[in-house]
């Protein structure tokens, strides 16, 4: 089966106040920290106004949401990755998760079993659908939901076969799953990162 790595970087960042993907932390942009957990061959899905900025930073495979679903959130991003690339299994990660470890993503990929449509971790009781593995066969379900403007990812998970994994069972640290929505979240990064051993 062919694997594709997908970084979702199309959020409006309203609560943060500026595009989170490009905010610098420890000398690197947040999206670069997240991308490190995926590997070099990564497709980025973003907003039209950010495409040039990613390309200027050396990113070659950057796409905007496929029509007619532009700006319709993470589901549109995942659908676009399916549509634009030739793969079977898609490792999906949000760009605002700078502490996620590569070993965690590899463990999730390893746990994709026959018949499952997705592998989704749970950390501290929170389901993490944007740090997950999806099979391309869910594309028709995604299309239907987007067409109906049902944009909640929890609705998608309710319609497909999901293998849920407790983060501690794959040796993942809860700190890995912090996602940066606000300035307060960003200010906690240093403290959270101190509890991690980087790969």
Swiss-Prot record:
Main location: cytoplasm
Class of this enzyme: transferase
Subcellular location: Cytoplasm
Names of required cofactors: Mg(2+)
Biological process annotations from GO: Mo-molybdopterin cofactor biosynthetic process
Keywords: Cytoplasm, GTP-binding, Magnesium, Metal-binding, Molybdenum cofactor biosynthesis, Nucleotide-binding, Transferase
E.C. code: 2.7.7.77
Molecular function GO labels: GTP binding; metal ion binding; molybdenum cofactor guanylyltransferase activity; nucleotidyltransferase activity
Record InterPro entries: MobA-like_NTP_Trfase, Molybde_CF_guanTrfase, Nucleotide-diphossugar_trans
Annotated catalysed reactions: Mo-molybdopterin + GTP + H(+) = Mo-molybdopterin guanine dinucleotide + diphosphate
Role noted for this protein: Transfers a GMP moiety from GTP to Mo-molybdopterin (Mo-MPT) cofactor (Moco or molybdenum cofactor) to form Mo-molybdopterin guanine dinucleotide (Mo-MGD) cofactor.
Name of the protein this chain belongs to: Probable molybdenum cofactor guanylyltransferase
């Amino acid at each position: 089966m062919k694997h594709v790595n997908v970084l979702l970087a199309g959020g409006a960042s309203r609560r943060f106040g500026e595009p989170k993907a490009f905010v610098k932390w420890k000398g690197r942009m947040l999206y670069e920290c997240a991308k490190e957990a995926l590997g070099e061959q990564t497709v980025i899905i973003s907003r039209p106004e950010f495409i040039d900025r990613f390309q200027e930073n050396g990113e070659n495979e950057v796409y905007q949401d496929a029509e007619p679903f532009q700006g319709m959130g993470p589901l549109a991003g995942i659908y676009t990755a399916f549509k634009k690339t030739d793969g079977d299994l898609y490792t999906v990660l949000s760009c605002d998760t700078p502490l996620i470890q590569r070993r965690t993503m590899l463990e999730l990929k390893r746990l994709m079993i026959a018949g499952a449509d997705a592998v989704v971790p749970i950390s501290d009781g929170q389901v993490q659908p944007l740090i997950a593995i999806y099979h391309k066969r869910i594309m028709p379900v995604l299309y239907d939901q987007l067409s109906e403007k049902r944009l909640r990812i929890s609705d998608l998970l309710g319609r497909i076969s999901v293998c849920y994994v407790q983060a501690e069972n794959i040796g993942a640290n809860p700190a890995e799953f912090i996602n940066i929505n606000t300035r307060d979240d960003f200010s906690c990064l240093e403290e959270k990162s101190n509890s991690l051993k980087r790969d």
